[in-house]
Amino acid sequence: MADGHSFNNISLSGRGGKNPGLLKINSGGIQWKKQGGGKAVEVDRSDIVSVSWTKVTKSNQLGVKTKDGLYYKFVGFRDQDVPSLSSFFQSSYGKTPDEKQLSVSGRNWGEVDLHGNTLTFLVGSKQAFEVSLADVSQTQLQGKNDVTLEFHVDDTAGANEKDSLMEISFHIPNSNTQFVGDENRPPSQVFNDTIVAMADVSPGVEDAVVTFESIAILTPRGRYNVELHLSFLRLQGQANDFKIQYSSVVRLFLLPKSNQPHTFVVISLDPPIRKGQTMYPHIVMQFETDTVVESELSISDELMNTKFKDKLERSYKGLIHEVFTTVLRWLSGAKITKPGKFRSSQDGFAVKSSLKAEDGVLYPLEKGFFFLPKPPTLILHDEIDYVEFERHAAGGANMHYFDLLIRLKTDHEHLFRNIQRNEYHNLYTFISSKGLKIMNLGGAGTADGVAAVLGDNDDDDAVDPHLTRIRNQAADESDEEDEDFVMGEDDDGGSPTDDSGGDDSDASEGGVGEIKEKSIKKEPKKEASSSKGLPPKRKTVAADEGSSKRKKPKKKKDPNAPKRAMSGFMFFSQMERDNIKKEHPGIAFGEVGKVLGDKWRQMSADDKEPYEAKAQVDKQRYKDEISDYKNPQPMNVDSGNDSDSN
């Protein structure tokens, strides 16, 4: 690059471990972005005070200090990168990188260098280690000569590491010449006071700037008292207590709920907090929109006139979610994202949908999509490969809904289901305006193509891109597309078919996959005819006329006939149906099958194995019983005739 350099695998080093990402260095400054999204660092050229090189294990480390006292460490440079970048810093920034050497002697005595908000321990003028004073939570004098620095033990630091630094103790003898004291104030006291002044902490526990009591938090679920401190926030609940440094706060989201008196406030974290084995990258809070609060900030006059001048006010009175986000924004330095230009059919900021088995709302934002409240899922536009509108295959009430599939560049997919039909135009227009690729209508994802399918008439077929694709491609007689059409017409209540082998594991909604299989095998010609655009009603009548003679004997089943074999999915459904009803009180009967289908698809082959084993046993049972049934003894024949005569 003529105007800069780009590196694909550079890690940002800190208390949270090493996070690999993309680093760009140009004449305007330094930008680093974590791989897979999340934390980002931007340092303007005018804010850079100094740069330095340090030789570390297997690579080189670039240190960047800013006017605000922040110190960034980027690790992963090759030896051949050092000369070219050093020349670039000299020519573009006017900064000559210093070369820091590490001490490997193993000695634990030396000198302390305090610069900005960084403490560096030197052994023989070489660096042994360094820590950021911004991570210091408090200091304590131990005896006459020892000073202990305690670090923030928050729930995000070291989320990807097994160990995290908690405290360091320094021994400062009375003979120390760097921190000169007197009889009433020994060198250890001088050192302690110096750290307190530079780290902006008190010798005791830091008081909260402001506290919001009994806030409803949906993820992780519970009611918490939210304390905003100068360098961290704390969530105090009855069962859990989380401490989060502001350096882990990536962004704030302020998202009102449509037609409801609540507002979401989301705090995005990197690294996330951890509760047991569960990671929470987003804290989802729910405020009552009309609640008014009056808060007084507990901040010294010195800080109000320096660090927070023209940012924070001494007191606030207003809506609780606005006061909360305003104070948190300036304390943490994170930006706030609010709804953009998108409006739903009800003039709201989001559309109702479901993700996996959870109902929620999807917010189309200016730079991404955000599904709330559970599981909170943020998808940036830069991460999206394409989107696709999908019509429900089933008929009836489901025909008034559609799905939105978002496929990421990492090949991961998010399927947002059960979006109301009247939101189709709004979503398509918004997504098109963002330049996102739309894989729809057989690849013809144009505005005219979608408009032809999404006409304003009330015909249910108008919203079905798959049905239109079938009609346009009738000559090809695509079995895959015809499956969807036959599925919408044939409704035998999801009963099992005669074939109940291993293919049933693909069923997603209470045996729907089995219905597909039966339709494909027995009526291929009728499927092709349906693709020519015949009305569903006429198709059904024609099918009834042509098969009336065959169907009459089947109206009454032989009670002595053996019970059909069940698939692995059906065994799974029997076991889990009651659990689903307990987890989702009041769930509709039709939704139970959808939830079961989603859970079945997410299960691994090992998890399915017990149910598939039962299916194989049941299949053999049915095979044996049907053999005896079809080859009965004379007595059994008489019994069968008696049954038919009843």
Swiss-Prot record:
Main location: nucleus
Biased composition (Acidic residues): 476-493
GO molecular function, a single term: DNA binding
Bias (Basic and acidic residues): 514-529, 601-628
GO biological process, one term: polar nucleus fusion
Region (Disordered): 471-569, 601-646
Protein name, UniProt field: FACT complex subunit SSRP1
Lineage, broadest ranks: Eukaryota, Viridiplantae, Streptophyta, Embryophyta, Tracheophyta
Gene name in the database record: SSRP1
